Protein backbone atom coordinates (compact mmCIF):
# COMPACT_ATOMS: atom_id res chain seq x y z
CA UNK A 1 0.00 0.00 0.00
CA UNK A 2 2.82 2.45 0.85
CA UNK A 3 4.29 1.85 -2.62
CA UNK A 4 1.16 2.34 -4.70
CA UNK A 5 0.20 5.49 -2.77
CA UNK A 6 2.88 7.27 -4.83
CA UNK A 7 0.68 6.90 -7.92
CA UNK A 8 -1.53 9.93 -8.50
CA UNK A 9 -3.75 8.21 -11.07
CA UNK A 10 -5.38 5.59 -8.87
CA UNK A 11 -8.54 4.69 -7.04
CA UNK A 12 -7.49 4.62 -3.40
CA UNK A 13 -7.84 1.24 -1.74
CA UNK A 14 -6.15 -0.56 1.13
CA UNK A 15 -5.27 -4.17 0.36
CA UNK A 16 -5.14 -6.61 3.24
CA UNK A 17 -4.67 -10.34 3.70
CA UNK A 18 -6.88 -12.75 5.61
CA UNK A 19 -3.79 -14.80 6.41
CA UNK A 20 -1.76 -14.31 9.57
CA UNK A 21 0.71 -11.43 9.59
CA UNK A 22 3.46 -12.37 7.16
CA UNK A 23 7.17 -11.73 6.84
CA UNK A 24 8.55 -8.35 5.87
CA UNK A 25 9.84 -7.77 2.37
CA UNK A 26 13.46 -8.89 2.30
CA UNK A 27 15.95 -6.84 0.29
CA UNK A 28 19.20 -8.56 -0.66
CA UNK A 29 21.83 -6.27 -2.24
CA UNK A 30 24.42 -8.27 -4.20
CA UNK A 31 27.71 -7.48 -5.89
CA UNK A 32 26.83 -8.64 -9.41
CA UNK A 33 24.13 -10.20 -11.57
CA UNK A 34 26.04 -13.48 -11.35
CA UNK A 35 25.94 -13.38 -7.56
CA UNK A 36 22.26 -12.47 -7.76
CA UNK A 37 21.50 -15.79 -9.47
CA UNK A 38 23.70 -17.72 -7.03
CA UNK A 39 22.04 -16.13 -3.99
CA UNK A 40 18.51 -16.74 -5.26
CA UNK A 41 19.29 -20.42 -5.88
CA UNK A 42 20.85 -20.70 -2.42
CA UNK A 43 17.79 -19.17 -0.78
CA UNK A 44 15.52 -21.57 -2.66
CA UNK A 45 17.44 -24.51 -1.23
CA UNK A 46 17.48 -23.00 2.27
CA UNK A 47 13.74 -22.43 2.24
CA UNK A 48 13.16 -25.95 0.99
CA UNK A 49 14.82 -27.23 4.13
CA UNK A 50 13.36 -24.65 6.50
CA UNK A 51 9.76 -24.63 5.25
CA UNK A 52 9.60 -27.99 3.45
CA UNK A 53 8.60 -26.18 0.26
CA UNK A 54 8.41 -27.85 -3.14
CA UNK A 55 10.15 -26.28 -6.12
CA UNK A 56 6.74 -25.28 -7.46
CA UNK A 57 6.31 -23.03 -4.41
CA UNK A 58 8.93 -20.61 -5.80
CA UNK A 59 8.73 -17.98 -8.53
CA UNK A 60 11.41 -15.67 -9.89
CA UNK A 61 9.93 -12.53 -11.41
CA UNK A 62 11.81 -10.15 -13.68
CA UNK A 63 10.99 -7.04 -15.67
CA UNK A 64 12.30 -8.25 -19.05
CA UNK A 65 12.55 -11.69 -20.67
CA UNK A 66 16.28 -11.38 -21.21
CA UNK A 67 16.91 -11.48 -17.45
CA UNK A 68 16.06 -15.19 -17.37
CA UNK A 69 19.40 -16.24 -18.91
CA UNK A 70 21.63 -16.06 -15.86
CA UNK A 71 19.03 -17.72 -13.59
CA UNK A 72 18.46 -20.54 -16.06
CA UNK A 73 22.19 -21.22 -16.26
CA UNK A 74 22.65 -21.20 -12.48
CA UNK A 75 19.64 -23.47 -11.92
CA UNK A 76 20.95 -25.95 -14.48
CA UNK A 77 24.33 -25.93 -12.71
CA UNK A 78 22.68 -26.49 -9.33
CA UNK A 79 20.22 -29.06 -10.74
CA UNK A 80 17.19 -27.02 -9.72
CA UNK A 81 14.30 -27.84 -12.08
CA UNK A 82 12.58 -24.82 -13.58
CA UNK A 83 10.11 -23.77 -16.23
CA UNK A 84 9.71 -20.56 -18.20
CA UNK A 85 6.10 -19.57 -17.66
CA UNK A 86 4.46 -18.01 -20.71
CA UNK A 87 7.57 -18.23 -22.87
CA UNK A 88 10.55 -20.35 -23.88
CA UNK A 89 13.96 -20.86 -22.36
CA UNK A 90 16.68 -18.40 -23.27
CA UNK A 91 18.68 -20.59 -25.63
CA UNK A 92 15.52 -21.70 -27.47
CA UNK A 93 14.58 -18.17 -28.54
CA UNK A 94 14.85 -17.65 -32.30
CA UNK A 95 17.35 -14.81 -32.28
CA UNK A 96 19.63 -16.74 -29.91
CA UNK A 97 19.41 -19.90 -32.05
CA UNK A 98 20.31 -17.82 -35.11
CA UNK A 99 23.49 -16.49 -33.47
CA UNK A 100 24.39 -19.93 -32.15
CA UNK A 101 23.98 -21.31 -35.69
CA UNK A 102 26.60 -18.81 -36.89
CA UNK A 103 28.89 -19.94 -34.08
CA UNK A 104 28.36 -23.59 -34.98
CA UNK A 105 29.32 -23.00 -38.61
CA UNK A 106 32.42 -21.05 -37.61
CA UNK A 107 33.54 -23.90 -35.36
CA UNK A 108 32.43 -26.63 -37.80
CA UNK A 109 31.71 -25.54 -41.40
CA UNK A 110 30.40 -29.03 -42.15
CA UNK A 111 27.36 -28.46 -39.89
CA UNK A 112 24.74 -28.47 -42.66
CA UNK A 113 21.75 -27.83 -40.40
CA UNK A 114 23.36 -24.67 -39.03
CA UNK A 115 24.61 -23.39 -42.38
CA UNK A 116 21.20 -23.80 -43.99
CA UNK A 117 19.72 -21.78 -41.14
CA UNK A 118 22.04 -18.80 -41.61
CA UNK A 119 22.90 -18.75 -45.32
CA UNK A 120 20.08 -16.29 -45.95
CA UNK A 121 19.94 -14.62 -42.54
CA UNK A 122 20.13 -11.70 -42.50
CA UNK A 123 18.57 -11.68 -45.95
CA UNK A 124 21.25 -11.77 -48.65
CA UNK A 125 19.23 -12.97 -51.65
CA UNK A 126 20.00 -16.70 -51.41
CA UNK A 127 16.52 -18.19 -51.65
CA UNK A 128 14.97 -21.62 -51.13
CA UNK A 129 15.41 -22.69 -54.78
CA UNK A 130 19.15 -21.96 -54.60
CA UNK A 131 19.44 -23.95 -51.37
CA UNK A 132 17.65 -26.90 -53.01
CA UNK A 133 20.11 -26.77 -55.92
CA UNK A 134 23.05 -26.74 -53.50
CA UNK A 135 21.66 -29.78 -51.65
CA UNK A 136 21.09 -31.66 -54.92
CA UNK A 137 24.59 -30.78 -56.13
CA UNK A 138 26.10 -31.96 -52.84
CA UNK A 139 24.30 -35.31 -53.08
CA UNK A 140 25.33 -35.74 -56.72
CA UNK A 141 28.99 -35.05 -55.99
CA UNK A 142 29.06 -36.77 -52.57
CA UNK A 143 30.33 -33.53 -51.08
CA UNK A 144 29.26 -31.36 -48.16
CA UNK A 145 27.04 -28.30 -48.41
CA UNK A 146 30.02 -26.14 -47.41
CA UNK A 147 32.24 -27.64 -50.13
CA UNK A 148 29.65 -26.86 -52.81
CA UNK A 149 29.20 -23.21 -51.86
CA UNK A 150 32.98 -22.78 -51.56
CA UNK A 151 33.60 -24.17 -55.06
CA UNK A 152 30.29 -23.88 -56.92
CA UNK A 153 31.81 -23.78 -60.42
CA UNK A 154 34.09 -26.75 -59.76
CA UNK A 155 31.13 -28.92 -58.74
CA UNK A 156 28.82 -27.67 -61.48
CA UNK A 157 26.28 -25.77 -59.37
CA UNK A 158 23.80 -24.36 -61.87
CA UNK A 159 23.05 -20.83 -60.65
CA UNK A 160 23.42 -17.42 -62.28
CA UNK A 161 26.37 -15.07 -61.81
CA UNK A 162 24.48 -12.88 -59.35
CA UNK A 163 23.87 -15.88 -57.08
CA UNK A 164 27.50 -16.99 -57.44
CA UNK A 165 28.60 -13.56 -56.19
CA UNK A 166 26.25 -13.80 -53.21
CA UNK A 167 27.57 -17.26 -52.32
CA UNK A 168 31.14 -15.97 -52.65
CA UNK A 169 30.40 -13.05 -50.31
CA UNK A 170 28.88 -15.40 -47.75
CA UNK A 171 31.76 -17.90 -47.79
CA UNK A 172 34.34 -15.11 -47.60
CA UNK A 173 32.52 -13.66 -44.58
CA UNK A 174 32.38 -17.03 -42.82
CA UNK A 175 36.00 -17.81 -43.70
CA UNK A 176 37.08 -14.53 -42.10
CA UNK A 177 35.43 -15.68 -38.87
CA UNK A 178 36.85 -19.21 -39.10
CA UNK A 179 40.36 -17.74 -39.39
CA UNK A 180 39.96 -16.12 -35.95
CA UNK A 181 38.73 -19.16 -33.99
CA UNK A 182 42.13 -19.84 -32.39
CA UNK A 183 43.27 -16.24 -31.93
CA UNK A 184 40.17 -14.54 -30.47
CA UNK A 185 38.27 -15.42 -27.32
CA UNK A 186 34.55 -16.21 -27.44
CA UNK A 187 33.49 -12.67 -26.58
CA UNK A 188 35.75 -10.97 -29.13
CA UNK A 189 34.82 -13.34 -31.95
CA UNK A 190 31.16 -13.47 -30.95
CA UNK A 191 30.81 -9.69 -31.11
CA UNK A 192 32.69 -9.67 -34.44
CA UNK A 193 30.24 -12.22 -35.87
CA UNK A 194 27.16 -10.36 -34.63
CA UNK A 195 28.43 -7.07 -36.03
CA UNK A 196 29.95 -8.12 -39.36
CA UNK A 197 27.13 -10.52 -40.28
CA UNK A 198 24.85 -7.51 -39.63
CA UNK A 199 22.65 -9.50 -37.25
CA UNK A 200 22.80 -6.47 -34.97
CA UNK A 201 21.47 -4.17 -37.70
CA UNK A 202 18.63 -6.57 -38.43
CA UNK A 203 17.70 -6.97 -34.75
CA UNK A 204 17.97 -3.27 -33.88
CA UNK A 205 16.17 -1.93 -36.95
CA UNK A 206 12.71 -1.99 -35.34
CA UNK A 207 11.25 -0.41 -32.20
CA UNK A 208 8.09 -2.48 -31.71
CA UNK A 209 7.77 -4.32 -28.35
CA UNK A 210 8.66 -7.75 -29.77
CA UNK A 211 11.74 -6.30 -31.48
CA UNK A 212 12.83 -4.66 -28.23
CA UNK A 213 12.56 -8.03 -26.48
CA UNK A 214 14.77 -9.60 -29.18
CA UNK A 215 17.27 -6.77 -28.79
CA UNK A 216 17.43 -7.33 -25.04
CA UNK A 217 17.97 -11.05 -25.61
CA UNK A 218 20.88 -10.43 -27.99
CA UNK A 219 22.42 -7.96 -25.55
CA UNK A 220 22.03 -10.46 -22.72
CA UNK A 221 23.60 -13.14 -24.92
CA UNK A 222 26.64 -10.87 -25.38
CA UNK A 223 26.69 -10.38 -21.60
CA UNK A 224 26.82 -14.18 -21.31
CA UNK A 225 29.80 -14.32 -23.68
CA UNK A 226 31.60 -11.69 -21.63
CA UNK A 227 30.77 -13.47 -18.39
CA UNK A 228 32.03 -16.78 -19.82
CA UNK A 229 35.39 -15.31 -20.85
CA UNK A 230 35.83 -13.42 -17.59
CA UNK A 231 35.07 -16.56 -15.55
CA UNK A 232 37.64 -18.59 -17.47
CA UNK A 233 40.25 -15.85 -17.00
CA UNK A 234 39.56 -15.68 -13.25
CA UNK A 235 40.00 -19.47 -13.07
CA UNK A 236 43.34 -19.22 -14.90
CA UNK A 237 41.94 -21.08 -17.90
CA UNK A 238 42.24 -18.40 -20.57
CA UNK A 239 43.18 -21.05 -23.15
CA UNK A 240 39.67 -22.51 -22.71
CA UNK A 241 37.82 -19.27 -23.42
CA UNK A 242 37.45 -19.77 -27.17
CA UNK A 243 34.22 -20.00 -29.16
CA UNK A 244 34.51 -23.80 -29.25
CA UNK A 245 34.60 -23.88 -25.44
CA UNK A 246 31.59 -21.57 -25.18
CA UNK A 247 29.55 -23.79 -27.51
CA UNK A 248 30.49 -26.85 -25.45
CA UNK A 249 29.26 -25.15 -22.28
CA UNK A 250 25.99 -24.07 -23.91
CA UNK A 251 25.54 -27.60 -25.25
CA UNK A 252 25.99 -29.07 -21.77
CA UNK A 253 23.48 -26.63 -20.30
CA UNK A 254 20.87 -27.20 -23.00
CA UNK A 255 21.34 -30.99 -22.80
CA UNK A 256 20.50 -30.88 -19.08
CA UNK A 257 17.50 -28.69 -19.89
CA UNK A 258 16.16 -31.08 -22.56
CA UNK A 259 16.57 -34.05 -20.21
CA UNK A 260 14.18 -32.41 -17.72
CA UNK A 261 11.37 -31.08 -19.87
CA UNK A 262 8.52 -32.96 -18.20
CA UNK A 263 5.97 -31.12 -16.12
CA UNK A 264 6.32 -31.46 -12.38
CA UNK A 265 7.80 -29.72 -9.38
CA UNK A 266 9.66 -26.78 -10.90
CA UNK A 267 10.59 -23.23 -10.00
CA UNK A 268 8.63 -20.79 -12.17
CA UNK A 269 10.56 -18.09 -14.03
CA UNK A 270 8.48 -15.37 -15.65
CA UNK A 271 8.09 -11.72 -16.44
CA UNK A 272 5.97 -9.72 -14.03
CA UNK A 273 3.39 -9.23 -16.78
CA UNK A 274 3.02 -13.02 -17.04
CA UNK A 275 2.61 -13.34 -13.26
CA UNK A 276 -0.68 -11.44 -13.05
CA UNK A 277 -3.31 -13.58 -11.35
CA UNK A 278 -0.80 -16.10 -9.97
CA UNK A 279 0.42 -16.56 -6.40
CA UNK A 280 3.34 -18.45 -4.87
CA UNK A 281 4.47 -19.04 -1.29
CA UNK A 282 7.85 -17.46 -2.12
CA UNK A 283 8.60 -14.83 -4.75
CA UNK A 284 11.94 -13.35 -5.81
CA UNK A 285 11.73 -10.00 -7.61
CA UNK A 286 15.12 -9.55 -9.25
CA UNK A 287 16.90 -6.67 -10.95
CA UNK A 288 15.57 -3.91 -8.69
CA UNK A 289 17.73 -1.23 -10.27
CA UNK A 290 17.24 1.99 -12.18
CA UNK A 291 16.99 1.41 -15.94
CA UNK A 292 15.75 -2.11 -15.34
CA UNK A 293 12.88 -1.55 -12.94
CA UNK A 294 11.68 1.08 -13.66
CA UNK A 295 12.39 0.52 -17.34
CA UNK A 296 14.51 3.21 -19.06
CA UNK A 297 11.60 3.80 -21.44
CA UNK A 298 9.46 5.05 -18.55
CA UNK A 299 11.81 7.84 -17.46
CA UNK A 300 10.28 10.51 -19.69
CA UNK A 301 6.64 9.85 -18.84
CA UNK A 302 4.89 10.16 -15.47
CA UNK A 303 2.14 7.86 -16.72
CA UNK A 304 4.60 5.14 -17.73
CA UNK A 305 6.46 5.49 -14.44
CA UNK A 306 3.19 4.92 -12.60
CA UNK A 307 2.61 1.81 -14.71
CA UNK A 308 6.06 0.55 -13.67
CA UNK A 309 5.11 1.15 -10.04
CA UNK A 310 1.87 -0.79 -10.55
CA UNK A 311 3.90 -3.65 -11.98
CA UNK A 312 6.05 -3.79 -8.85
CA UNK A 313 2.88 -3.72 -6.76
CA UNK A 314 1.60 -6.69 -8.79
CA UNK A 315 4.90 -8.52 -8.29
CA UNK A 316 4.97 -8.01 -4.52
CA UNK A 317 1.37 -9.15 -4.12
CA UNK A 318 2.16 -12.47 -5.89
CA UNK A 319 3.91 -13.61 -2.68
CA UNK A 320 1.90 -15.51 -0.09
CA UNK A 321 4.63 -15.93 2.53
CA UNK A 322 8.06 -14.64 1.54
CA UNK A 323 9.00 -11.87 -0.89
CA UNK A 324 12.65 -11.17 -1.69
CA UNK A 325 13.91 -8.24 -3.75
CA UNK A 326 17.43 -8.16 -5.16
CA UNK A 327 19.56 -5.37 -6.62
CA UNK A 328 23.06 -5.71 -8.06
CA UNK A 329 25.87 -3.22 -7.68
CA UNK A 330 27.39 -4.28 -11.03
CA UNK A 331 25.66 -5.79 -14.04
CA UNK A 332 26.74 -6.64 -17.57
CA UNK A 333 24.51 -4.66 -19.93
CA UNK A 334 24.99 -3.98 -23.63
CA UNK A 335 28.37 -5.73 -23.43
CA UNK A 336 29.67 -3.35 -20.74
CA UNK A 337 29.94 -3.57 -17.00
CA UNK A 338 27.57 -0.97 -15.60
CA UNK A 339 27.38 0.21 -12.01
CA UNK A 340 23.80 -0.01 -10.82
CA UNK A 341 21.68 2.35 -8.77
CA UNK A 342 18.98 0.65 -6.69
CA UNK A 343 15.48 1.33 -7.94
CA UNK A 344 13.76 4.48 -6.73
CA UNK A 345 10.80 2.25 -5.83
CA UNK A 346 12.77 0.78 -2.92
CA UNK A 347 12.73 4.23 -1.33
CA UNK A 348 8.94 4.37 -1.65
CA UNK A 349 8.31 1.24 0.42
CA UNK A 350 7.71 1.97 4.10
CA UNK A 351 10.95 0.90 5.88
CA UNK A 352 8.82 -0.70 8.59
CA UNK A 353 7.90 -3.39 6.08
CA UNK A 354 11.34 -4.14 4.63
CA UNK A 355 14.47 -5.83 5.99
CA UNK A 356 17.95 -5.87 4.44
CA UNK A 357 19.71 -9.24 4.48
CA UNK A 358 23.23 -10.41 3.77
CA UNK A 359 24.45 -13.85 2.69
CA UNK A 360 23.14 -15.30 5.94
CA UNK A 361 19.45 -15.97 5.24
CA UNK A 362 18.33 -15.08 8.75
CA UNK A 363 19.74 -11.73 9.81
CA UNK A 364 23.50 -11.13 9.48
CA UNK A 365 24.03 -7.56 8.31
CA UNK A 366 26.32 -6.44 5.53
CA UNK A 367 29.71 -5.79 7.09
CA UNK A 368 32.79 -6.41 4.94
CA UNK A 369 34.09 -4.09 2.18
CA UNK A 370 34.39 -4.98 -1.48
CA UNK A 371 37.97 -5.44 -2.76
CA UNK A 372 39.05 -4.39 -6.27
CA UNK A 373 39.07 -6.77 -9.22
CA UNK A 374 41.40 -6.78 -12.29
CA UNK A 375 40.21 -4.50 -15.06
CA UNK A 376 38.11 -6.07 -17.79
CA UNK A 377 36.66 -4.11 -20.67
CA UNK A 378 33.91 -4.68 -23.22
CA UNK A 379 32.24 -3.01 -26.18
CA UNK A 380 28.63 -2.51 -27.21
CA UNK A 381 27.05 -4.56 -29.99
CA UNK A 382 24.34 -2.02 -30.77
CA UNK A 383 24.88 -0.42 -34.20
CA UNK A 384 26.52 2.96 -33.50
CA UNK A 385 23.64 5.02 -34.89
CA UNK A 386 21.15 3.12 -32.71
CA UNK A 387 22.90 3.38 -29.35
CA UNK A 388 20.71 5.38 -26.94
CA UNK A 389 23.70 6.71 -25.00
CA UNK A 390 27.40 6.49 -25.75
CA UNK A 391 28.93 5.16 -22.55
CA UNK A 392 32.69 4.59 -22.27
CA UNK A 393 33.96 1.15 -21.31
CA UNK A 394 34.01 0.50 -17.59
CA UNK A 395 36.48 -1.67 -15.72
CA UNK A 396 35.00 -4.34 -13.46
CA UNK A 397 35.82 -4.90 -9.81
CA UNK A 398 36.36 -8.16 -7.92
CA UNK A 399 35.07 -9.17 -4.51
CA UNK A 400 36.91 -11.46 -2.23
CA UNK A 401 33.88 -12.64 -0.33
CA UNK A 402 30.26 -12.98 -1.42
CA UNK A 403 29.04 -11.66 1.93
CA UNK A 404 30.01 -8.03 1.32
CA UNK A 405 29.37 -4.52 2.46
CA UNK A 406 28.04 -1.93 0.10
CA UNK A 407 26.45 1.42 0.67
CA UNK A 408 24.22 2.06 -2.32
CA UNK A 409 22.11 5.11 -3.00
CA UNK A 410 18.86 4.93 -4.90
CA UNK A 411 17.70 7.62 -7.29
CA UNK A 412 15.81 9.18 -4.41
CA UNK A 413 18.54 8.87 -1.79
CA UNK A 414 17.84 5.58 0.02
CA UNK A 415 21.02 4.20 1.58
CA UNK A 416 21.40 0.43 1.54
CA UNK A 417 24.05 -1.24 3.63
Which role does the model predict for each range below?
Residues 36-37, 128-129, 358:
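Conserved GTPase G-domain signal focused on the G5
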Residues 64-65, 84-94:
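Conserved helicase motor
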Residues 349-417:
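Acidic, low-complexity intrinsically disordered tails
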Residues 32, 63, 87-88, 272-275:
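Structured loop/turn residues at secondary-structure junctions
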